A protein has these predicted regions:
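A short, proline-enriched helix->beta-strand linker immediately N-terminal to the Walker B motif
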Residues: 170-174
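Conserved ABC ATPase "signature" region
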Residues: 73, 126-146, 255
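Short catalytic/signature loops enriched in Gly
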Residues: 142-145, 238-287
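Conserved ABC transporter NBD signature motif
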Residues: 62-73
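A short, surface-exposed alpha-helical micro-motif characterized by mixed small hydrophobic
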Residues: 218-220
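Short, glycine/charged-rich "phosphate-handling" switch motifs in NTP-dependent
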Residues: 224, 236
Length: 287
């Protein structure tokens, strides 16, 4: 395992009480594998990904568990070590909305360049420029040399997301965490971004932790799937097993809620996840 999360607990302490956003989550990610964490909004999947990089802000706090990465527990590292050795260098992250993740005051080239400055200070200015342009070309940005000098608001949504992927991949990290990277994109651009991520993975052997609520996306890219509900893992299985034989009632409810093609389904009411059912009362299904 390149990454092993054990009994992770991330709580938010508010005036209204304690919100156990992530409560005892465990899973492992193998080298060159794509693992999808799936669940409805509020299930704790994004908080899990932010916890791995220790990006939890107050009133949130990681209160327990361990995150083993290449033999070291990330929760035991000092903040300086996380900044210099882990974030961006060994573990890259693509956030959900590139327009809020990219700084509108700086060109996209400058922002990718900054990542190289921090993690590869041995590169000179010319080498960094060449590396950034190469990375923009690799993610399919046309006229990459010109786009280097563009500001984020001058690019399309698809191009901004490609810039985010370039920024996350420029240091060739061991793991790429993608938090709902295609949610704000149309179906065509979404397919292109997913294909791009698969290509980059095949070329570099990168492990991908993909956060999504879209089971259609999961079917396209996942090797392994972790299903989360209210801060807990309720089922884990290979993608093939999960879609062929879902065992936990919550997983079944998620799959049943997917709109189905065909005339016989056109007039049928779409199924929903029953909020009155306590899905945590059922045993976990870990295969």
């Amino acid at each position: 395992m390149i990454l092993e999360v054990k009994d992770l607990k991330t709580y938010f302490f508010t005036d209204k009480g304690v919100n156990k956003a992530v409560d005892g989550v465990s899973f492992g990610l193998k080298k060159s594998q794509t693992l999808c964490i799936v669940g409805e909004s509020g299930s704790g999947k994004s908080i899990t990904s932010l916890s791995i990089l220790r990006l939890i802000e107050k009133p949130g706090k990681i209160v327990g568990g361990s995150i083993q990465f290449l033999g070291q527990d990330l929760l035991q590292l000092k903040e300086k070590q996380m900044q210099k050795e882990i974030r961006g260098k060994k573990i890259g992250m693509i956030f959900q909305e590139p327009m809020t993740s990219l700084n509108p005051s700086y060109t996209v080239g400058f922002q990718i360049n900054e990542v190289l400055k921090i993690h590869h200070p041995n590169l000179n200015k010319k080498e960094r420029l060449e590396r950034v342009v190469y990375e923009l070309e690799r993610v399919g940005i046309p006229h990459a040399g010109d786009k280097y000098h563009e500001y984020p608001f001058n690019l399309s949504g698809g191009q901004r997301q490609r810039v985010m992927i370039a920024m996350a991949m420029v240091c060739e990290p061991e793991i790429l965490i993608a938090d709902e990277p295609t949610t704000a994109l149309d179906v065509t651009i979404q397919a292109q971004i997913l294909e791009l991520m698969k290509e980059l993975q095949q070329k570099k052997g990168t492990s991908i932790l993909f956060i999504t609520h879209d089971l259609g996306v999961v079917a396209q890219i996942a090797d392994e799937v972790v299903v989360m509900y209210k801060g807990h893992v309720v089922e884990q299985a290979s993608a093939k097993e999960l879609f062929a034989d879902p065992r936990h009632p919550y997983t079944k409810a998620l799959l049943n809620a997917i709109p189905k093609p065909g005339k016989e389904y056109r007039k049928k009411r779409l199924e929903t996840v029953d909020e009155n059912v306590d899905y945590l009362s059922f045993p976990k299904e870990l295969r």
